Amino acid sequence: MSATEHSFWPKATGLETAIPEDRRIDGIAEVTYQKLLAPIGGRRQTALAFEDEVNVFRRTLMHMGFPYSSRWYHTSTQAPTQLRDVLYFRRKDGVKSGSFKTFVQDGLASQLATIPEVTEVRTQVYLPWNKATWNTPNVAHDNPKEDHLHASIILGFADQAAREAFYANLAPQLNAEVVQYASAVHVYHIEKTLPFVLDGKRM
């Protein structure tokens, strides 16, 4: 993820959009399974990623979700994705996890999927974070409770003009609802994607 192009979600009262430098995320190691039992068959690939992580990241935080807590959405635009951003959300104090999940998946993401020139929408809603879930060696895993993140949305755009128009014109309108459920939105531009395992084979 970009080390310089981040923190560009529109500002709103009560919403943290500037990412503290010591909490900035370098990248994402994302694993998506086709079936509920697929993780059992992928243990060898998971072990490879576990050992290799120190070569890529300085701090990693493993976020997991229940089955069906991740969604891929059909968008109104069928053009290929040229640019991607990832939005991380911190749940607002007092908001129940079920209400937050409904907002992310059925509210915000569903709206995003209908926007022209948005070519990709993917959501993940996380279980409570636990360091023991992914305690890779020689990589930092510190994650104070006040810094926890609870969901993410990956957005794809057809081109740079569409991306700029979204953040300038549409994203500010979404904040009226976002601030009811989230206390922070941290946005990063995804510079490149590097497959580690594809079709069960190490790249």
Predicted regions and their residues:
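Macromolecular interaction modules
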Residues: M1-M203
